UniProtKB/Swiss-Prot annotation:
Region annotated G5, chain positions: 327-329
Disulfide bonds: none
Residues annotated as binding GTP: 190-197, 236-240, 290-293
Pfam families, A to Z: EF-G_D2 (PF22042), GTP_EFTU (PF00009), IF-2 (PF11987), IF2_N (PF04760)
Protein name: Translation initiation factor IF-2
Locations listed in the record: Cytoplasm
Organism encoding this protein: Thermotoga petrophila (strain ATCC BAA-488 / DSM 13995 / JCM 10881 / RKU-1)
Domain tr-type G as annotated: residue spans: 181-349
Record lineage: Bacteria, Thermotogati, Thermotogota, Thermotogae, Thermotogales
Length: 693
């Protein structure tokens, strides 16, 4: 019998040489009720669990007859499930977002938001899609796809980057038995001045093994530490902007987020924003309540704010959020935080494909005066070696040198290891994926084809601004304007939302994708780019990086200091989104006094204008005895022998009607034009006022 005091489930699992997940599954099968791996069990319960597991193991070792019936039932169930799945067939020229949206019955804007939030893929209305993007969309909505064979007729159109990424997806799906655990990659987030950088520095200074004398003089953007014989990789650039940009580019590197909240300050605006980004990415969150060494620290109050403002319930309060009180300054609680990171990694089964060509994600890139183009990466799969041919975004190269996080030269890098690569022809885009290919020649060919493809798609990459909304044509009756709102205070955000909601109408939906407090950042721009939205800022500035990115991505960013001006601009944009209303205007009347038959022309009416005018570019109705006999266009209009555009009363004129010769003397004519009149939406507030009247 194992002697032990009261302990948590994960600690018991460790003593039994099991993973917490395996133990939880065993306990569930045995009927033992525990909430999570953080639940406590007392000594008596622990010994009962051990006895039950030993008995279960003894039974498992006894030979048993195969349950054929169950297998058949499972096969039948699988067949039924497959039948239930919806399937669509696409032609090669139908790989466009608007066409796919129509085929699967999901609005474009809904697809754009779902793909950005859930899968980190940025799409635009009507965008020509890669096959892999189509598969991701259909996977999200559980729809099978079939592409007609003629797709393969043009090899030139295949995106090699898409095939490289698909290679790893297939490995993960078809060769699960070859996947092995890898060290977790952690991003630290939180409000400014809550201690993100101090925590990263504390972990680095106390845990990085074999630091060279004099310290590390250069950071490569990430580092690895060792805890109880296991490794953890930390991205050394805290903040959710980097995190969001990675997601937007489909190159997410983070496995776990540590959300830092100061015990003396509580949950603040950037805490909420960071949490929303982590939650949207479906990444496990561990909360580190920092600064517990301060006199005014209040851990319990901070936990209460986690519940009230974020919906994060600590495990000790019956929830499933791991909360660790720490002091990054003194080091108190940091070891426990690291242990919790390893525990969460184990529970989430973070794995990789350890063999074959490497795949990595770029976390930093720059042009170094001495070394040339360099890229700091975290290896995701395979082994990256010196001499490998690589491609990334818009460039390629051969790995000339590799440096680890201590800037020491190495020959190979393994999954989750941060390294610096030298050897790219140009500086690769930060946050993009790196792939190893068979040769430098192949790498060059892949990138050249991609650059040609990108150039061809350049025109489709421009986003809308408020003026261009006036020219927008959408495939649906109801139009949608996506908005990202940023303001100086939560009070201002509430006021903006209230004002904007009053502009809702039955013709146009105003969709607030995100609303927050603080300056307009790169993450706001990336989100706006993903949903083809407009950013509206109230009493906030646009940071320089965001301004540059907005120009690059073609995202419209507007800032205001007066709320009514923002509302007026928005009203104008909404009016511009509506197609003009066609209004008929009667401009004159006349009477046919004489009918002339002209060879090769037909019948021409001699008309006396009674009032108003006749317009050559307008329309006419012909009435006989009060009955409408013709409505259509004027083919020709003459005053005497001269072709004219307009004839006014009381003049006479000759008219040839388009496609109609059955005219008689005495027929009455009504002339009219169709004018396009700017249409105004019926806003919610105005509609309510009208109903009251």
């Amino acid at each position: 019998m194992i002697e032990m005091a009261r302990l948590r489930v994960y600690e018991l699992a460790r003593k039994l040489n099991m993973s917490p997940k395996e133990l939880l599954q065993e306990l569930e099968e045995l009927g033992v009720n525990v909430k999570s791996h953080m639940s406590y069990v007392d000594e008596e319960m622990a010994n009962i669990i051990i006895d039950l597991l030993e008995e279960d193991n003894r039974k498992a070792k006894q030979p048993s007859k195969p349950k054929k019936e169950k297998g058949e039932e499972e096969v039948e169930k699988e067949v039924v499930e497959k039948k239930k799945k919806k399937k669509i067939t696409l032609k090669p020229d139908e790989l466009k977002l608007d066409i796919i949206a129509e085929k699967i019955g999901v609005p474009q804007n809904k697809i754009i938001q779902d793909m950005f939030v859930k899968r980190g893929i940025a799409l635009r209305p009507g965008q020509i899609l890669k096959l892999e993007e189509v598969e991701q969309i259909l996977k999200e909505y559980k729809i099978e796809i079939e592409i007609e064979e003629e797709q393969q007729t043009s090899v030139e159109e295949v995106d090699e980057f898409e095939l490289l990424e698909k290679r790893y997806q297939e490995l993960y799906e078809k060769e699960k038995d070859k996947l092995v655990p890898r060290p977790p990659v952690v991003t630290v987030m939180g409000h400014v001045d809550h201690g993100k950088t101090t925590l990263l520095d504390r972990i680095r200074s106390t845990r990085v093994a074999e630091r060279e004398e004099g310290g590390i003089t250069q950071s490569i953007g990430a580092y690895q530490v060792e805890v109880n014989g296991k490794k953890i990789t930390f991205i050394d650039t805290p903040g959710h902007e980097l995190f969001t940009e990675m997601r937007a580019r489909g190159a997410q590197a983070t496995d776990i987020v540590v959300l830092v909240v100061a015990a003396d300050d509580g949950v603040m605006p950037q805490t909420i924003e960071a949490y929303n980004h982590a939650k949207a990415a479906n990444v496990p969150i561990i909360v580190a309540i920092n600064k517990i060494d301060k006199p005014n620290a209040n851990v319990e109050k901070t936990k209460q704010e986690l519940v009230e403002k974020l919906g994060l319930i600590p495990e000790e309060w019956g929830g499933d959020t791991i909360v660790v009180p720490i002091s990054a300054r003194t080091g108190q609680g940091v070891d426990e935080l690291l242990e919790m990171i390893l525990l969460v990694a184990e529970m989430n089964e973070i794995k990789c494909y350890p063999e074959g060509p490497a795949r990595a994600v770029i976390i930093e890139s720059k042009l170094d005066k001495k070394m040339g183009p360099v890229a700091s990466v975290i290896v995701k799969d395979g082994v990256l070696k010196v001499g490998d041919a690589v491609v990334a975004s818009n460039t390629y190269g051969r790995v000339r040198n590799l440096f680890d996080d201590n800037m020491r030269p190495i020959r190979e890098a393994y999954p989750s290891q941060p390294v610096m690569i030298l050897g790219f022809e140009d500086v690769p885009d930060v946050h993009s994926n790196v792939y190893v290919v068979e040769s430098a020649e192949k790498a060059k060919e892949i990138v050249e084809k991609r650059l040609q493809r990108l150039e061809a798609q350049k025109q489709s990459r421009k986003h809308i601004n408020l003026e261009e909304l006036m020219k927008m044509m959408q495939e649906k009756e109801k139009k949608v304007l996506n908005l990202i709102l940023k303001a100086d205070t939560y009070g201002s955000v509430a006021a903006l939302k209230n004002a904007i909601n009053k502009l809702q109408s039955k013709e146009i939906e105003l969709n607030i994708v995100h609303a927050g407090v603080g300056e307009i950042s790169t993450s706001d721009v990336m989100l706006a780019a993903a949903v083809d939205g407009v950013i509206l800022g109230f009493r906030v500035k646009v940071n320089n990086q965001a301004r540059r990115l907005a120009e690059q991505e073609g995202v419209d960013v507007r800032t205001y200091s007066i709320i009514y001006k923002l509302v007026e601009d928005l009203k104008l944009a909404l009016e511009g989104m509506l197609e003009p209303e066609e209004v008929e205007e009667v401009i004159g009347h006349g009477e046919i006094r004489k009918v002339f038959k002209i060879s090769k022309v037909g019948k021409v009416a001699g008309v006396q204008m009674l009032d108003g005018k006749a317009d050559r570019n307008g329309f006419v109705r012909i009435y006989r005895n009060g009955q409408l006999v013709f409505e259509g266009k004027i083919e020709s209009l003459k005053h005497y022998k001269e072709d004219v555009n307009v004839v006014e009363a009381p003049q006479e004129c000759g008219i040839k009607f388009a496609g109609f010769d059955d005219i008689q003397e005495g027929d009455e004519l009504e002339f009219y034009v169709i004018r396009k009149v700017k249409r105004k939406p019926t806003f919610v507030e105005e509609q309510a006022d009208q109903e009251q009247k």
